Amino acid sequence: MARDYYEILGVSRDSSKEEIKRAYRRLARKYHPDVNKEPGAEERFKEINRAYEVLSDNELKARYDRFGEAGLSGAAAAASGFQDFAGMGGFADIFESFFTNFAGAGASYARSRQGPVRGDDLRFDLKLEFLEAIFGGEKQIRISHLEVCNVCGGSGAKPGTEVKTCPTCGGSGQVRRATRTPFGNFTQVSVCPTCGGSGQVLEEPCYNCNGEGLAQTTKKLRINIPAGVDSGTRLRVSGEGDAGRRGGPPGDLYVYLFVEPDPDFQRDGLTILSEVRVSYLQAILGAKVSVPTVDSKAGLEEEVELTIPAGSQPGTVLTLEGKGVPRIGNPMSRGDHQITLVVEIPTRISSEERELLMRLAELHGERINKRDGFLGGLLRGLAQMPGNREREEE
């Protein structure tokens, strides 16, 4: 009767994948034929490999937990009237075993497992103030990513120790197992459980990276923010992702920008939007008022003098050309700044002002309610203009 695989590795049934892996590595080093010359060590080593091959594979582990060794041979599935191919490693492995016999595809597969692997890309979310997005600049960020271990140089081996050819697969990175199916006998090709497909094993793993060849490192980066960016803009920083494995190139860092709102300005594409409050007399008679722009708020210039034409209506939009958002890649080309007039109607006036307004209303032949004073006639008309009616409702 076959021994229990969990018992072989000395782990419980609820052990994590990482715990199973650690137990396997510890036992594999202890009973490796190159290290342990005692009788029975080689058979024990094969037993350990078989146990790890099953328990490290989610599908095989699930079948073993449910049906035991019989579930791995297909007996449990056959009893239910059909053949389950989950334990065969998939049809890709079957086809691969065919081509291995005729075209040497197995060697190609092993080389792909042992070849360079590009590092993972990383994402970093960066908040910008409104004016930082408009004018750009430089931001310093701190990221954590994988870099080639500075102790072992990426080999994964402790300095002074060797990286040896895997004795299980002979350096090919793969193992073969004969499988019986309703279609006949097939040779299944799978990743070597000892070396994980690399074809090499460590005499002793590096203490800094635990044999991975890569170590987590925190570093500072300076990111150049182009003028005119907006929320959702993505910046690519080449080569600042995780380091590659086995000499592969590093991944990239993608910085996603999120722009915070501003109390004075809004943005619509390349257009800056704002409001300016003027009195009803300024709207009627015309005036010149100072208004802030994104440039003045950034300290690049003084506030701009805006001309209010006589007879301006509430909601009138005045435009400052070239005072908007710079175009990305061409900061000399800018959008406009559109300013909406908000006409303020006073709720209290002096008796002298009321007398003047009543005389003005009489000149225009306006009928006014004397009990309401200035709330009638001209001022009533101003108050009922669309832009100001909305503001009164607020």
From Swiss-Prot:
Primary residence: cytoplasm
Gene Ontology terms: cellular component: cytoplasm
Domain J: 4-68
SUPFAM superfamilies per record: Chaperone J-domain, DnaJ/Hsp40 cysteine-rich domain, HSP40/DnaJ peptide-binding domain
Cofactor(s) needed for function: Zn(2+)
GO molecular function, one term: unfolded protein binding
GO-annotated biological processes: chaperone cofactor-dependent protein refolding; DNA replication; protein refolding; response to heat
Alphabetic keyword roster: Chaperone, Cytoplasm, DNA replication, Metal-binding, Repeat, Stress response, Zinc, Zinc-finger
Subcellular locations according to the entry: Cytoplasm
Binding annotation for Zn(2+) 2: C166, C169, C192, C195
Keyword Transport: no
Positions of CR-type zinc fingers: 136-218
Entry's cofactor comment: Binds 2 Zn(2+) ions per monomer.
Function: Participates actively in the response to hyperosmotic and heat shock by preventing the aggregation of stress-denatured proteins and by disaggregating proteins, also in an autonomous, DnaK-independent fashion. Unfolded proteins bind initially to DnaJ; upon interaction with the DnaJ-bound protein, DnaK hydrolyzes its bound ATP, resulting in the formation of a stable complex. GrpE releases ADP from DnaK; ATP binding to DnaK triggers the release of the substrate protein, thus completing the reaction cycle.
Family: Belongs to the DnaJ family.
Identification of the protein by name: Chaperone protein DnaJ
